[in-house]
Regions:
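Generic serine detector
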Residues: 3-4, 42, 56, 85, ...
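Secondary-structure boundary elements
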Residues: 1-55
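Alpha-helix N-cap/loop-to-helix boundary motif
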Residues: 49, 53-56, 98, 102-104
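Hydrophobic/aromatic-rich core segments of domains that either
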Residues: 12-14, 62-135
Length: 135
């Protein structure tokens, strides 16, 4: 597991200055397509996101923490409750009904110490989802 993380870290950061490396890691993880993949949603198996090529907030932020800590950045996890029906997304009628029936879910992101401040860093929403209106 660690070797695949180390390889990607080297690929994404090699030859970059600290800020450029931090941004590159964020963008590469953010651009992994969002998908719920239960087999990689644990602290033991999250690195599989690199071979599966998709994942939800949980493996994305476990990976982000690993890589940011390699850059010397302290990272904390943050968990937010949310409801799918509260998102300002124009769901088709059948999906709106499903979203309204869903219980409260939990979202994982990170707070990263940058310049002495804890900054919220959320790499969940890839570009196609952003175009749909997800935050």
């Amino acid at each position: 597991m660690t070797s695949s993380i180390d390889e990607k870290f080297e690929e994404w950061t090699c030859g970059r200055r600290a800020v450029e490396a931090r941004v590159a890691v964020f963008e590469k993880i953010r651009d992994i397509p969002y998908a719920v993949a239960p087999g990689i949603n644990s602290a033991l198996h999250y690195a599989r996101i690199l071979t599966v090529g998709k994942g939800s907030c949980t493996p994305k932020h476990f990976l982000l923490r690993d890589m940011y800590e390699k850059l010397g950045l302290p990272v904390l996890y943050v968990v937010y409750p949310f409801r799918w029906s509260d998102l300002e997304v124009d769901y088709p009628a059948h999906l709106r009904k499903l979203a309204e029936a869903m219980p409260v879910s939990h979202h994982l992101a990170c707070r990263v110490e940058i310049g002495g401040r804890l900054v919220l860093v959320d790499a969940t929403v890839d570009s196609p989802l952003k175009r749909l209106g997800l935050p």
